[in-house]
């Protein structure tokens, strides 16, 4: 195993594919994107395939996930926002599953790749723009004009709102990417301390106790972060969708 804490984020080809000079290779990132989607879909399918009045553990988790996202969407975008439930629920489950899979040794954390998180962010913002203009036409541009702003300040405020809107895919993607990247690097560093000190013999084993405790604590924290980052991504998605549904609501 490499001692480089960033080695775990390297993308490599599994099945090299090149068409017309364009690289379409199937990589470890491709594999774990497919695995994340398959695990999420598989869990929901098996959890709900034998539904009972008194739900089992897996059915309870599936139902809690459904209600959790449904309530989040209603609070963030109103009842009209429920039309976007499939999108928000799919994003939440995909990001959560990808984050959790990345916690296992030798597995690849796809949410530590900025291109992956940026693609998800573009999907969200693209949906906001398409639906906003489809539903409201050019009235969607009211999202850049907050109510109650004095006319003399309007040009400045509109400019700030436009810049803020354009920065959304960047902030949405970087937040998820940076948190997963930093957390996994920290885990790798402390785990490296444990291995290095343990290799020194009896004296080293004694010194490895503290890094080992820190590694265990950080691992627990990273599982929490895996959920929180999926939650934050879903919450922000609901907030952005609210702008598409109610462009003059702020």
From Swiss-Prot:
> Function, please?
Key component of the proton channel; it plays a direct role in the translocation of protons across the membrane.
Under which name does UniProt file this protein?
ATP synthase subunit a
Membership in a protein family: Belongs to the ATPase A chain family.
**Gene Ontology cellular-component annotations:** plasma membrane; proton-transporting ATP synthase complex
SUPFAM superfamilies given in the database record: F1F0 ATP synthase subunit A
Upper lineage: Bacteria, Pseudomonadati, Pseudomonadota, Alphaproteobacteria, Hyphomicrobiales
Q: Name one GO molecular function term.
A: proton-transporting ATP synthase activity, rotational mechanism
Topology of the protein relative to the lipid bilayer: Multi-pass membrane protein
A Pfam family (short name) is ATP-synt_A
Give the source species: Rhizobium leguminosarum bv. trifolii (strain WSM2304)
Q: Does the keyword Cell inner membrane apply?
A: yes
Q: Does the keyword Ribosomal protein apply?
A: no
Q: Which HAMAP family match?
A: ATP_synth_a_bact
Which coarse location class applies to the principal site listed for this UniProt protein?
Answer: membrane
Q: Which residues cross the membrane?
A: 29-49, 84-104, 114-134, 143-163, 193-213, 216-236
Instruction: State the source organism's domain of life.
Output: Bacteria
The subunit field of the Swiss-Prot or TrEMBL record says: F-type ATPases have 2 components, CF(1) - the catalytic core - and CF(0) - the membrane proton channel. CF(1) has five subunits: alpha(3), beta(3), gamma(1), delta(1), epsilon(1). CF(0) has three main subunits: a(1), b(2) and c(9-12). The alpha and beta chains form an alternating ring which encloses part of the gamma chain. CF(1) is attached to CF(0) by a central stalk formed by the gamma and epsilon chains, while a peripheral stalk is formed by the delta and b chains.
